[in-house]
């Protein structure tokens, strides 16, 4: 069933275009190289069809596993836009190298600071603070995220 879904997504994403594919908890996909091949194809070829990929993961260190880095490196290095938040307890030097950032850029996100991220757009880098409007804050509730 999983591969049927990926095949359907591939068809929509790469032939019809104008699609957005969102992968949350992406570290769960890293266990399957066939799924990674699909996602790598989406990332590399989707822009030609005006399609976009959103990848979210709380475990960025898993992307650096030598067994899968040939799949994950293009997934991480190809996108035009990246939002990097606090990466957690990781090997700093490995993360800096893998994400293609420098020490001062890493310093923006090295501590947990709610709402702060490093936004990368091509060669441009920005320190962003994401603030939810008051009417949206009610949607988040009071548990977690601190």
Describe each region flagged by the PLM:
Residues 1-108, 134:
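Conserved P-loop NTPase motor cores
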Residues 1-15, 107-146:
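Conserved P-loop NTPase motor module
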